[in-house]
Structures are given as C-alpha cells and as structure tokens.
C-alpha cells in the first residue's frame, strides 16, 4: 500500500495570510511521527468538491512552500494537486512546476471527463 499525505488550508486561513504557517504545521506533523509519505497532495480544503478553483498563483506558492520544506528535511516524494480538478483547469494545473499528478474527485464520477483528464496528465 502507498500512503498519501494530504494537506491544505481552509478559506479563513487563506484569507488571513496564515497559509504558510498552516501548511508548515501540517508538514511538521508527519515528520514528528517519522513517516515519509509516498505521495504528498496539496488540496486546499475550500476547493474540495466545491467547484471553486484555486488560481495558479495560489497553487504555485503552496508548492513552493512544500518543496522548500521537503528539501530542508531531505524528503523525496512527488507532489500532487487536488481540489476541483476538471477538464477545464487540468492543463493549467499540470503546467505548474512541481505538480506531478492530480487527485481527481467529482470529475472522476463522469467516465468521459475522467478519461480526458487522465490523458492530459499522462500526455
């Protein structure tokens, strides 16, 4: 089995400009348990299943925070993105440096949409 560690902020945290410390606290939590994730998923809570998409700048800044942490701790894992992933936004998401895949929620319920998303991810 593979473990996937999911982190992300709620809307109040995003709006309060406390996102970095919030994400770092989540990342530190798994280090305290001496657990190294096989995959790490950045999934802003406010974007899960809501249809509200995170803009690419928000995703980029979060991936940068995560990458800096992983490098500092010498943890080698892939970063995924989840949170209202759709046919409409998949190209933009996978073009963000550091994103190596996606967790697809609601869009995976439609086989045709999911196939389109999967084909864009795998190239």
Regions found by a protein language model. Name each.
Residues 1-123:
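Active-site loop-to-helix "anion-binding N-cap" substructures in soluble metabolic enzymes
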